[in-house]
Protein backbone atom coordinates (compact mmCIF):
# COMPACT_ATOMS: atom_id res chain seq x y z
CA UNK A 1 0.00 0.00 0.00
CA UNK A 2 1.15 3.61 -0.59
CA UNK A 3 1.95 4.31 3.08
CA UNK A 4 4.32 6.43 5.19
CA UNK A 5 6.33 5.15 8.18
CA UNK A 6 8.30 6.66 11.06
CA UNK A 7 10.24 4.61 13.61
CA UNK A 8 11.65 6.06 16.84
CA UNK A 9 14.32 4.34 18.92
CA UNK A 10 13.90 4.16 22.68
CA UNK A 11 16.53 6.80 23.48
CA UNK A 12 15.05 9.18 20.91
CA UNK A 13 11.48 8.98 22.25
CA UNK A 14 10.05 11.22 24.94
CA UNK A 15 9.57 8.45 27.53
CA UNK A 16 11.98 5.68 26.56
CA UNK A 17 9.40 3.77 24.52
CA UNK A 18 10.05 2.15 21.20
CA UNK A 19 7.63 3.75 18.73
CA UNK A 20 6.54 2.28 15.40
CA UNK A 21 4.04 4.29 13.35
CA UNK A 22 2.65 3.89 9.86
CA UNK A 23 -0.16 5.33 7.79
CA UNK A 24 -2.04 2.74 5.79
CA UNK A 25 -3.19 4.48 2.62
CA UNK A 26 -5.52 3.06 0.01
CA UNK A 27 -4.76 3.26 -3.69
CA UNK A 28 -5.90 6.34 -5.58
CA UNK A 29 -9.68 6.35 -5.90
CA UNK A 30 -10.10 3.63 -3.25
CA UNK A 31 -11.24 4.15 0.35
CA UNK A 32 -10.86 0.94 2.34
CA UNK A 33 -12.96 0.72 5.54
CA UNK A 34 -10.95 -0.56 8.52
CA UNK A 35 -11.71 -1.83 12.00
CA UNK A 36 -9.95 -2.98 15.15
CA UNK A 37 -9.90 -6.66 16.07
CA UNK A 38 -8.40 -9.04 18.65
CA UNK A 39 -7.58 -12.41 17.07
CA UNK A 40 -7.67 -15.32 19.53
CA UNK A 41 -5.63 -18.52 19.13
CA UNK A 42 -8.69 -20.56 18.17
CA UNK A 43 -9.49 -18.03 15.42
CA UNK A 44 -6.02 -18.16 13.87
CA UNK A 45 -5.90 -20.51 10.86
CA UNK A 46 -3.62 -23.55 10.96
CA UNK A 47 -3.61 -23.68 7.17
CA UNK A 48 -3.65 -20.25 5.55
CA UNK A 49 -4.48 -19.51 1.92
CA UNK A 50 -3.91 -16.08 0.44
CA UNK A 51 -6.77 -14.60 -1.55
CA UNK A 52 -4.62 -12.63 -3.98
CA UNK A 53 -1.74 -15.03 -4.61
CA UNK A 54 -3.52 -18.34 -3.88
CA UNK A 55 -0.54 -19.41 -1.76
CA UNK A 56 -1.21 -22.01 0.94
CA UNK A 57 1.00 -22.04 4.06
CA UNK A 58 0.84 -24.46 6.97
CA UNK A 59 1.15 -22.60 10.27
CA UNK A 60 2.32 -23.69 13.74
CA UNK A 61 -0.25 -24.97 16.21
CA UNK A 62 0.71 -22.56 19.00
CA UNK A 63 -0.38 -19.05 17.95
CA UNK A 64 -0.67 -16.21 20.45
CA UNK A 65 -3.51 -13.75 20.72
CA UNK A 66 -2.83 -10.53 18.79
CA UNK A 67 -4.45 -7.25 17.80
CA UNK A 68 -4.96 -6.27 14.18
CA UNK A 69 -6.55 -3.65 11.92
CA UNK A 70 -8.13 -5.71 9.12
CA UNK A 71 -10.15 -4.66 6.10
CA UNK A 72 -13.92 -4.65 6.49
CA UNK A 73 -15.01 -5.47 2.94
CA UNK A 74 -14.36 -9.16 2.14
CA UNK A 75 -12.95 -10.54 -1.08
CA UNK A 76 -9.29 -9.56 -1.18
CA UNK A 77 -7.83 -10.90 2.06
CA UNK A 78 -7.28 -9.91 5.67
CA UNK A 79 -4.73 -7.05 5.52
CA UNK A 80 -4.19 -7.11 9.31
CA UNK A 81 -1.63 -4.28 9.05
CA UNK A 82 -0.50 -3.60 12.64
CA UNK A 83 -0.72 -4.93 16.17
CA UNK A 84 0.80 -6.52 19.26
CA UNK A 85 0.88 -10.12 20.40
CA UNK A 86 0.71 -11.44 23.97
CA UNK A 87 4.48 -11.09 24.45
CA UNK A 88 4.39 -7.37 23.61
CA UNK A 89 5.96 -7.84 20.21
CA UNK A 90 4.72 -5.31 17.67
CA UNK A 91 4.55 -5.58 13.89
CA UNK A 92 3.55 -3.10 11.18
CA UNK A 93 3.24 -4.37 7.62
CA UNK A 94 3.74 -3.12 5.06
CA UNK A 95 5.31 -0.08 3.48
CA UNK A 96 5.30 -0.65 -0.28
CA UNK A 97 8.78 -0.02 -1.69
CA UNK A 98 10.37 0.60 -5.08
CA UNK A 99 13.26 -1.25 -6.70
CA UNK A 100 15.13 -1.24 -10.02
CA UNK A 101 15.42 -3.27 -13.18
CA UNK A 102 18.67 -4.98 -12.14
CA UNK A 103 17.03 -6.45 -9.04
CA UNK A 104 13.89 -7.40 -10.95
CA UNK A 105 16.04 -9.33 -13.39
CA UNK A 106 18.25 -10.95 -10.75
CA UNK A 107 15.38 -12.21 -8.58
CA UNK A 108 11.96 -11.80 -10.24
CA UNK A 109 8.90 -11.26 -8.10
CA UNK A 110 6.76 -14.35 -7.52
CA UNK A 111 3.48 -13.51 -9.24
CA UNK A 112 0.37 -15.67 -9.31
CA UNK A 113 -0.06 -17.37 -12.69
CA UNK A 114 -3.64 -18.48 -13.45
CA UNK A 115 -4.30 -21.90 -14.94
CA UNK A 116 -4.44 -22.24 -18.70
CA UNK A 117 -7.03 -24.42 -20.36
CA UNK A 118 -9.30 -26.92 -18.65
CA UNK A 119 -8.11 -29.61 -16.28
CA UNK A 120 -8.09 -33.01 -17.99
CA UNK A 121 -7.77 -31.57 -21.48
CA UNK A 122 -4.65 -31.42 -23.63
CA UNK A 123 -2.52 -28.36 -23.04
CA UNK A 124 -3.82 -27.74 -19.53
CA UNK A 125 -1.33 -25.91 -17.33
CA UNK A 126 -2.21 -25.72 -13.61
CA UNK A 127 -2.14 -22.42 -11.77
CA UNK A 128 1.06 -21.40 -10.04
CA UNK A 129 0.62 -19.68 -6.65
CA UNK A 130 2.32 -16.39 -6.03
CA UNK A 131 4.38 -15.41 -3.01
CA UNK A 132 3.59 -13.47 0.16
CA UNK A 133 2.22 -9.95 0.19
CA UNK A 134 0.93 -7.24 2.50
CA UNK A 135 -2.36 -9.11 2.64
CA UNK A 136 -0.67 -11.96 4.52
CA UNK A 137 2.34 -10.90 6.55
CA UNK A 138 0.93 -9.88 9.94
CA UNK A 139 -1.29 -12.97 10.00
CA UNK A 140 1.64 -15.27 9.18
CA UNK A 141 4.21 -13.78 11.56
CA UNK A 142 2.87 -11.76 14.51
CA UNK A 143 1.09 -14.64 16.34
CA UNK A 144 4.40 -16.53 16.58
CA UNK A 145 7.11 -13.89 17.10
CA UNK A 146 8.80 -13.93 20.52
CA UNK A 147 10.84 -10.76 19.94
CA UNK A 148 11.47 -8.20 17.23
CA UNK A 149 14.48 -10.17 16.01
CA UNK A 150 12.41 -13.34 16.01
CA UNK A 151 9.83 -11.63 13.83
CA UNK A 152 12.57 -10.75 11.34
CA UNK A 153 13.76 -14.36 11.36
CA UNK A 154 10.28 -15.82 10.83
CA UNK A 155 9.43 -13.49 7.96
CA UNK A 156 12.87 -13.93 6.42
CA UNK A 157 12.44 -17.70 6.39
CA UNK A 158 9.01 -17.36 4.76
CA UNK A 159 10.36 -15.00 2.10
CA UNK A 160 13.22 -17.33 1.23
CA UNK A 161 10.83 -20.28 1.00
CA UNK A 162 7.78 -18.77 -0.73
CA UNK A 163 8.99 -15.47 -2.15
CA UNK A 164 6.93 -12.30 -2.55
CA UNK A 165 5.04 -10.65 -5.38
CA UNK A 166 5.74 -7.09 -4.23
CA UNK A 167 8.50 -5.01 -2.65
CA UNK A 168 7.77 -4.20 0.98
CA UNK A 169 9.18 -2.76 4.20
CA UNK A 170 8.12 -4.25 7.53
CA UNK A 171 8.72 -3.04 11.10
CA UNK A 172 9.09 -5.23 14.21
CA UNK A 173 9.38 -3.93 17.76
CA UNK A 174 9.75 -5.03 21.34
CA UNK A 175 10.53 -2.99 24.42
CA UNK A 176 14.26 -2.91 23.60
CA UNK A 177 14.57 -2.88 19.82
CA UNK A 178 13.03 -1.90 16.50
CA UNK A 179 14.00 -3.74 13.33
CA UNK A 180 13.19 -2.71 9.78
CA UNK A 181 13.10 -5.39 7.06
CA UNK A 182 13.12 -4.62 3.34
CA UNK A 183 12.37 -7.24 0.71
CA UNK A 184 14.78 -7.37 -2.24
CA UNK A 185 13.37 -8.93 -5.38
CA UNK A 186 11.38 -12.12 -5.08
CA UNK A 187 13.26 -14.01 -2.35
CA UNK A 188 15.96 -11.80 -0.83
CA UNK A 189 15.80 -9.42 2.11
CA UNK A 190 17.80 -7.23 4.45
CA UNK A 191 16.95 -6.00 7.95
CA UNK A 192 18.56 -3.31 10.07
CA UNK A 193 18.15 -2.40 13.72
CA UNK A 194 16.98 1.16 14.26
CA UNK A 195 19.63 2.99 16.33
CA UNK A 196 18.35 3.61 19.85
CA UNK A 197 19.06 7.35 19.63
CA UNK A 198 17.59 7.88 16.17
CA UNK A 199 14.40 8.00 14.16
CA UNK A 200 13.74 6.58 10.69
CA UNK A 201 11.56 8.09 7.95
CA UNK A 202 10.16 5.86 5.21
CA UNK A 203 8.08 6.91 2.19
CA UNK A 204 7.30 4.33 -0.52
CA UNK A 205 10.93 3.88 -1.48
CA UNK A 206 13.68 1.47 -0.47
CA UNK A 207 15.32 3.32 2.39
CA UNK A 208 18.26 1.62 4.14
CA UNK A 209 21.40 3.50 3.06
CA UNK A 210 24.18 1.58 4.86
CA UNK A 211 24.45 -2.16 5.49
CA UNK A 212 27.20 -4.27 7.08
CA UNK A 213 27.34 -7.71 5.47
CA UNK A 214 29.92 -9.03 7.93
CA UNK A 215 27.62 -8.24 10.85
CA UNK A 216 24.61 -9.75 9.05
CA UNK A 217 26.53 -12.97 8.43
CA UNK A 218 28.10 -12.99 11.88
CA UNK A 219 27.01 -11.49 15.20
CA UNK A 220 23.86 -9.87 13.77
CA UNK A 221 24.13 -7.05 16.28
CA UNK A 222 22.47 -4.56 13.94
CA UNK A 223 22.01 -6.32 10.59
CA UNK A 224 20.36 -9.49 9.25
CA UNK A 225 19.84 -10.73 5.69
CA UNK A 226 18.91 -13.65 3.47
CA UNK A 227 21.51 -16.42 3.58
CA UNK A 228 22.93 -16.02 0.07
CA UNK A 229 22.80 -12.24 -0.22
CA UNK A 230 26.55 -11.70 -0.66
CA UNK A 231 26.92 -14.37 -3.36
CA UNK A 232 23.77 -13.24 -5.15
CA UNK A 233 24.93 -9.62 -5.21
CA UNK A 234 28.30 -10.67 -6.57
CA UNK A 235 26.80 -12.85 -9.29
CA UNK A 236 24.58 -10.04 -10.52
CA UNK A 237 27.06 -7.16 -9.94
CA UNK A 238 24.57 -5.29 -7.79
CA UNK A 239 26.90 -3.34 -5.50
CA UNK A 240 27.58 0.16 -6.82
CA UNK A 241 30.21 1.14 -4.23
CA UNK A 242 33.04 2.99 -6.01
CA UNK A 243 36.46 1.37 -5.77
CA UNK A 244 35.26 -2.16 -5.04
CA UNK A 245 37.54 -4.61 -6.80
CA UNK A 246 36.29 -7.70 -8.58
CA UNK A 247 32.66 -8.68 -8.28
CA UNK A 248 32.27 -7.42 -4.71
CA UNK A 249 30.17 -6.60 -2.86
CA UNK A 250 31.83 -4.36 -0.30
CA UNK A 251 31.54 -5.35 3.35
CA UNK A 252 29.62 -2.12 3.99
CA UNK A 253 27.49 -0.95 1.07
CA UNK A 254 24.52 1.30 0.29
CA UNK A 255 21.38 -0.80 -0.35
CA UNK A 256 19.46 2.23 -1.59
CA UNK A 257 21.98 2.55 -4.43
CA UNK A 258 22.19 -1.19 -5.06
CA UNK A 259 18.54 -2.16 -4.79
CA UNK A 260 16.50 1.04 -4.84
CA UNK A 261 15.19 3.58 -7.34
CA UNK A 262 15.81 7.24 -8.14
CA UNK A 263 13.04 7.84 -10.64
CA UNK A 264 11.28 11.04 -11.62
CA UNK A 265 8.15 9.78 -9.87
CA UNK A 266 10.14 9.27 -6.64
CA UNK A 267 10.87 13.00 -6.68
CA UNK A 268 7.20 13.95 -6.56
CA UNK A 269 5.81 10.98 -4.61
CA UNK A 270 8.48 9.80 -2.17
CA UNK A 271 11.48 12.00 -1.41
CA UNK A 272 9.35 15.07 -0.51
CA UNK A 273 7.73 13.12 2.33
CA UNK A 274 11.08 12.16 3.88
CA UNK A 275 12.24 15.76 3.40
CA UNK A 276 9.28 17.19 5.28
CA UNK A 277 9.36 14.71 8.16
CA UNK A 278 13.06 15.37 8.77
CA UNK A 279 12.52 19.10 8.33
CA UNK A 280 10.15 18.92 11.31
CA UNK A 281 12.44 16.85 13.54
CA UNK A 282 15.76 18.49 12.61
CA UNK A 283 14.66 22.07 11.90
CA UNK A 284 18.13 23.61 12.33
CA UNK A 285 19.33 22.12 9.06
CA UNK A 286 19.01 24.22 5.91
CA UNK A 287 15.95 22.93 4.07
CA UNK A 288 15.22 25.76 1.63
CA UNK A 289 17.03 27.80 -0.98
CA UNK A 290 20.15 27.23 -3.07
CA UNK A 291 22.25 26.27 -0.03
CA UNK A 292 19.82 23.67 1.30
CA UNK A 293 21.33 20.55 2.83
CA UNK A 294 18.47 18.56 1.32
CA UNK A 295 15.67 19.49 -1.08
CA UNK A 296 12.32 17.76 -1.61
CA UNK A 297 13.86 15.92 -4.55
CA UNK A 298 17.15 14.84 -2.95
CA UNK A 299 18.00 11.16 -3.34
CA UNK A 300 20.38 11.11 -0.36
CA UNK A 301 18.06 12.08 2.50
CA UNK A 302 19.30 9.88 5.39
CA UNK A 303 17.43 6.74 6.40
CA UNK A 304 17.98 7.48 10.10
CA UNK A 305 18.89 10.61 12.05
CA UNK A 306 19.32 11.77 15.62
CA UNK A 307 16.51 14.27 16.32
CA UNK A 308 17.21 17.70 17.79
CA UNK A 309 14.93 16.87 20.71
CA UNK A 310 13.09 13.77 21.86
CA UNK A 311 10.16 12.70 19.72
CA UNK A 312 6.60 12.61 21.11
CA UNK A 313 3.36 10.95 20.06
CA UNK A 314 2.21 14.38 18.91
CA UNK A 315 5.30 14.82 16.73
CA UNK A 316 4.53 11.50 15.06
CA UNK A 317 0.91 12.48 14.51
CA UNK A 318 1.94 15.84 13.06
CA UNK A 319 4.42 14.52 10.52
CA UNK A 320 2.09 11.69 9.48
CA UNK A 321 -0.73 14.22 8.99
CA UNK A 322 1.31 16.80 7.13
CA UNK A 323 0.57 18.51 3.85
CA UNK A 324 3.83 20.55 3.78
CA UNK A 325 2.60 23.23 6.18
CA UNK A 326 4.71 26.37 6.16
CA UNK A 327 6.08 25.74 2.68
CA UNK A 328 5.09 26.65 -0.85
CA UNK A 329 3.97 23.04 -1.34
CA UNK A 330 1.04 23.16 1.13
CA UNK A 331 -2.13 22.25 -0.78
CA UNK A 332 -4.16 24.33 1.71
CA UNK A 333 -1.65 27.19 1.90
CA UNK A 334 -1.20 30.59 0.30
CA UNK A 335 2.55 30.51 -0.33
CA UNK A 336 3.96 29.74 -3.75
CA UNK A 337 1.78 29.20 -6.80
CA UNK A 338 -1.02 26.81 -7.74
CA UNK A 339 1.65 24.68 -9.41
CA UNK A 340 3.86 24.42 -6.31
CA UNK A 341 0.88 23.80 -4.03
CA UNK A 342 0.05 20.67 -6.01
CA UNK A 343 3.58 19.55 -6.79
CA UNK A 344 4.13 16.84 -4.18
CA UNK A 345 2.12 14.01 -2.65
CA UNK A 346 0.98 14.95 0.89
CA UNK A 347 1.50 12.57 3.83
CA UNK A 348 -1.89 13.41 5.31
CA UNK A 349 -3.87 12.48 2.22
CA UNK A 350 -7.55 11.96 1.46
CA UNK A 351 -7.06 8.18 1.27
CA UNK A 352 -5.42 7.57 4.64
CA UNK A 353 -7.23 4.45 5.88
CA UNK A 354 -5.76 4.23 9.35
CA UNK A 355 -2.74 5.23 11.42
CA UNK A 356 -1.38 2.83 14.04
CA UNK A 357 1.30 3.96 16.51
CA UNK A 358 2.74 1.00 18.44
CA UNK A 359 4.16 2.11 21.80
CA UNK A 360 6.04 -0.18 24.21
CA UNK A 361 6.73 1.55 27.52
CA UNK A 362 9.70 0.23 29.55
CA UNK A 363 8.43 1.72 32.83
CA UNK A 364 5.08 -0.11 32.66
CA UNK A 365 4.59 -3.72 33.72
CA UNK A 366 4.33 -6.22 30.83
CA UNK A 367 0.61 -6.75 31.49
CA UNK A 368 -0.17 -3.18 30.44
CA UNK A 369 3.01 -2.11 28.62
CA UNK A 370 1.67 -2.10 25.05
CA UNK A 371 -0.46 0.82 23.86
CA UNK A 372 -1.78 0.90 20.31
CA UNK A 373 -2.70 4.44 19.32
CA UNK A 374 -5.22 4.51 16.46
CA UNK A 375 -6.69 7.03 14.04
CA UNK A 376 -8.95 6.48 11.04
CA UNK A 377 -9.56 8.47 7.89
CA UNK A 378 -7.58 11.44 6.60
CA UNK A 379 -4.96 12.30 9.22
CA UNK A 380 -5.22 16.04 8.67
CA UNK A 381 -8.65 15.94 10.34
CA UNK A 382 -8.58 13.01 12.79
CA UNK A 383 -7.18 12.34 16.27
CA UNK A 384 -5.13 9.54 17.80
CA UNK A 385 -6.77 7.51 20.56
CA UNK A 386 -4.91 5.05 22.83
CA UNK A 387 -5.96 1.44 23.33
CA UNK A 388 -4.35 -1.02 25.70
CA UNK A 389 -3.41 -4.05 23.60
CA UNK A 390 -3.45 -6.79 26.26
CA UNK A 391 -7.21 -7.33 26.00
CA UNK A 392 -9.67 -9.95 24.80
CA UNK A 393 -11.98 -7.56 22.93
CA UNK A 394 -11.95 -4.11 21.33
CA UNK A 395 -14.60 -1.41 21.87
CA UNK A 396 -17.49 -1.67 19.43
CA UNK A 397 -16.99 1.95 18.36
CA UNK A 398 -13.63 0.95 16.83
CA UNK A 399 -14.44 -2.67 15.94
CA UNK A 400 -17.91 -2.53 14.38
CA UNK A 401 -17.09 -0.78 11.11
CA UNK A 402 -19.35 -1.93 8.28
CA UNK A 403 -19.28 -1.30 4.55
CA UNK A 404 -22.35 0.91 5.03
CA UNK A 405 -21.64 4.59 5.66
CA UNK A 406 -22.79 5.67 9.13
CA UNK A 407 -21.74 8.09 11.84
CA UNK A 408 -22.07 5.37 14.50
CA UNK A 409 -18.46 4.15 14.36
CA UNK A 410 -15.08 5.82 14.58
CA UNK A 411 -13.94 5.01 11.02
CA UNK A 412 -16.92 6.44 9.18
CA UNK A 413 -17.35 9.40 11.54
CA UNK A 414 -13.78 10.45 10.77
CA UNK A 415 -14.25 9.90 7.04
CA UNK A 416 -17.28 12.18 7.11
CA UNK A 417 -15.45 14.83 9.13
CA UNK A 418 -12.53 14.85 6.70
CA UNK A 419 -14.67 15.14 3.59
CA UNK A 420 -16.71 17.99 5.09
CA UNK A 421 -13.82 19.90 6.66
CA UNK A 422 -11.59 19.71 3.59
CA UNK A 423 -13.85 21.92 1.48
CA UNK A 424 -13.90 24.63 4.18
CA UNK A 425 -10.43 23.93 5.52
CA UNK A 426 -9.68 27.30 7.08
CA UNK A 427 -13.16 27.85 8.53
CA UNK A 428 -13.17 24.36 10.09
CA UNK A 429 -9.52 24.41 11.13
CA UNK A 430 -9.97 25.76 14.65
CA UNK A 431 -12.65 23.21 15.53
CA UNK A 432 -10.53 20.36 14.15
CA UNK A 433 -7.44 21.47 16.07
CA UNK A 434 -9.42 21.86 19.28
CA UNK A 435 -10.76 18.33 18.86
CA UNK A 436 -7.31 16.89 18.16
CA UNK A 437 -5.77 18.60 21.18
CA UNK A 438 -8.63 17.70 23.51
CA UNK A 439 -8.76 14.03 22.50
CA UNK A 440 -4.96 13.81 22.62
CA UNK A 441 -4.89 15.25 26.12
CA UNK A 442 -7.67 12.92 27.20
CA UNK A 443 -5.62 10.02 25.84
CA UNK A 444 -2.49 10.82 27.81
CA UNK A 445 -4.48 11.26 31.01
CA UNK A 446 -6.32 8.02 30.34
CA UNK A 447 -3.06 6.08 30.15
CA UNK A 448 -1.72 7.69 33.33
CA UNK A 449 -4.91 7.02 35.29
CA UNK A 450 -5.41 3.45 34.08
CA UNK A 451 -1.77 2.57 34.70
CA UNK A 452 -2.21 3.65 38.30
CA UNK A 453 -5.51 1.78 38.65
CA UNK A 454 -4.18 -1.58 37.44
CA UNK A 455 -0.70 -1.43 38.98
CA UNK A 456 -1.73 -3.30 42.13
CA UNK A 457 -4.05 -5.81 40.47
CA UNK A 458 -3.16 -9.49 40.08
CA UNK A 459 -1.85 -10.00 36.56
CA UNK A 460 -4.77 -12.27 35.63
CA UNK A 461 -7.26 -9.47 36.35
CA UNK A 462 -5.49 -6.81 34.31
CA UNK A 463 -6.80 -7.63 30.78
CA UNK A 464 -10.45 -7.35 31.81
CA UNK A 465 -9.83 -4.02 33.52
CA UNK A 466 -7.94 -2.72 30.48
CA UNK A 467 -10.83 -3.74 28.24
CA UNK A 468 -13.28 -1.85 30.47
CA UNK A 469 -11.02 1.20 30.37
CA UNK A 470 -10.77 1.02 26.57
CA UNK A 471 -14.57 0.80 26.32
CA UNK A 472 -15.19 3.73 28.66
CA UNK A 473 -12.69 5.89 26.82
CA UNK A 474 -14.22 4.98 23.45
CA UNK A 475 -17.55 6.36 24.65
CA UNK A 476 -15.89 9.64 25.60
CA UNK A 477 -14.23 9.76 22.17
CA UNK A 478 -17.61 9.14 20.54
CA UNK A 479 -19.06 12.21 22.28
CA UNK A 480 -16.20 14.45 21.14
CA UNK A 481 -16.22 13.05 17.60
CA UNK A 482 -19.98 13.50 17.22
CA UNK A 483 -19.61 17.09 18.42
CA UNK A 484 -16.91 17.82 15.84
CA UNK A 485 -18.98 16.23 13.09
CA UNK A 486 -21.85 18.54 14.01
CA UNK A 487 -19.58 21.60 13.91
CA UNK A 488 -18.01 20.90 10.52
CA UNK A 489 -21.39 19.93 9.06
CA UNK A 490 -22.81 23.27 10.20
CA UNK A 491 -19.85 25.27 8.88
CA UNK A 492 -19.85 23.56 5.50
CA UNK A 493 -23.65 23.75 5.21
CA UNK A 494 -23.55 27.53 5.73
CA UNK A 495 -21.13 27.84 2.81
CA UNK A 496 -23.18 25.81 0.32
CA UNK A 497 -23.52 27.39 -3.14
CA UNK A 498 -27.31 27.44 -2.90
CA UNK A 499 -27.44 29.43 0.32
CA UNK A 500 -29.49 32.67 0.36
CA UNK A 501 -29.50 35.35 3.04
CA UNK A 502 -33.20 36.27 2.96
CA UNK A 503 -35.61 34.02 4.88
CA UNK A 504 -39.19 34.14 6.10
CA UNK A 505 -39.17 31.71 9.01
CA UNK A 506 -37.17 33.12 11.91
CA UNK A 507 -37.41 31.07 15.12
Kindly label every feature range from the protein language model:
Residues 324-325, 329-456:
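Substrate-recognition/cap regions that form aromatic- and gly/pro-loop-enriched pockets
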Residues 231-368:
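Glycine-rich, aromatic-lined ligand/substrate-binding cores of catalytic
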Residues 2-134, 154-289, 293:
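A contiguous strand-loop segment
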Residues 138-144:
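Short, well-ordered beta-strand elements within core beta-sheets of diverse protein domains
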Residues 436-507:
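Histidine-centered catalytic/metal-binding microenvironments
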Residues 21-35, 96, 181-183, 319-330, ...:
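Soluble extracytoplasmic regions of secretory-pathway and membrane proteins
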Residues 144-150:
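Short, charged, surface-exposed loops that flank catalytic or proteolytic processing sites
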Residues 60-66, 152, 334-342:
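Short Pro/Gly-enriched beta-strand edge/turn motifs at strand-loop
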Amino acid sequence: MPCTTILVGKNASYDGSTLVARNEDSSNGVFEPKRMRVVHPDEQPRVYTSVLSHLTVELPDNPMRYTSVPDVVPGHGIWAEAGFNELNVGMSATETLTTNERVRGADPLVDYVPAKGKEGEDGYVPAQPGGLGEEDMVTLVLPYAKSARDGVRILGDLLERYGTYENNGIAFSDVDEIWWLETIGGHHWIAKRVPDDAYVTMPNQLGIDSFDLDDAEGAQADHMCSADLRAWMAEWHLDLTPGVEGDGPATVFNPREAFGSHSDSDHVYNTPRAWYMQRCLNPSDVWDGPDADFTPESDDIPWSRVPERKVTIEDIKYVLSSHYQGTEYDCYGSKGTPATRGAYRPIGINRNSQLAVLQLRPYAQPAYRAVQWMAFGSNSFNALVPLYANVETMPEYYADTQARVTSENFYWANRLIGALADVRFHECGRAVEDYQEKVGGMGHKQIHDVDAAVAALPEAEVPAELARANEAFAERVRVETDALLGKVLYTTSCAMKNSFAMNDNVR
